[in-house]
Amino acid sequence: MLFRSIAYGKAYAALSMGRPSRLVLQKQREKPVFMENLMDLADGPMFLEAGGQLIRDAAGEVIGAIGVTGDTGEMDDVCATAGIHAAGHKTCADFTDPKVIRGINVKEAKPQISTP
């Protein structure tokens, strides 16, 4: 039963932070105090280890997340990616736009210029 909780925590970390869980782990290592405070605010359990991936459609929009556990974090990531691709979807790594790779997919608006 613990495996299910770990997988859920990886998926939740990816979905709530908008990036693969391995990048959330990296951010935790870079800014531990910030991430500790952020995790206190989270609505669910985040498990910070590789294996949580965002599921994206062809346009790069997030449509869900998956968490995989049972092997090393790196192999869990490989399995998550394989499952996403087998289902016909995409991961952050399938896009070259840096905003999508970081887990952000925003539609940029043109700057509004107001004149007096």
Give names to the regions the model predicted:
Residues 5-35:
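A charged amphipathic helix-loop-strand protein-protein interaction module that recurs
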Residues 69-116:
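Juxtadomain coupling helices with adjacent low-complexity linkers
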Residues 27-47, 104-116:
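A broadly tuned preference for mixed-charge, low-complexity surface segments
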Residues 40-85:
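Extended hydrophobic
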Residues 14-16, 23, 32, 63, ...:
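Residues in flexible loops and secondary-structure boundaries
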